[in-house]
Design a protein with these regions (language model features):
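N-terminal first-folded block
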Residues: 4-33
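Short flexible/disordered coil segments
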Residues: 14, 69-70, 96-97
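A broad, low-specificity signal for short, low-complexity segments enriched in glycine/proline
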Residues: 1-5, 14-19, 49-54, 90-92
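An amphipathic, aromatic/His-enriched active-site/gating alpha helix that lines ligand/cofactor pockets
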Residues: 26, 30-38, 58-91
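Short, well-ordered beta-strand segments in beta-rich or mixed alpha/beta enzyme
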Residues: 4-10, 42-69
Length: 97
């Protein structure tokens, strides 16, 4: 079973920055506290764009990543961010070396 790496780039609309940043922090905490298979779940801020953030995640398997995406806390986050982002780009990766 291969580990899965996720890079999720989020650009928040200016007027929602504080609200969504709080939600990102809560999602980080809930994921670490509740989700099996989470090896890494780090939130980074962009040094050149104050409205942009990146999650770098590592999961033990694709199945455990899918389980995370089916949790109540992830569903709540997804609903909260609706229409509050300028951009969302998600890359699903597998480490080669």
């Amino acid at each position: 079973m291969s580990k899965v790496v996720i890079v999720a780039k989020i650009k928040i609309k200016e007027e929602f920055k504080d609200e969504i940043l709080d939600e990102l922090k809560e999602l980080h905490k809930s994921t670490h506290d509740l989700d099996d298979g989470c090896i890494q779940y780090e939130l980074h801020k962009d040094l050149e764009d104050t409205n942009s953030f990146t999650f770098i995640e590592t999961w033990e398997s694709a199945e455990l990543l899918e389980a995370h995406m089916a949790t109540a806390h992830f569903a709540s986050f997804a609903k909260t961010i609706e229409n509050k982002l300028d951009a969302l780009e998600i890359s699903k990766l597998e480490k080669l070396i």
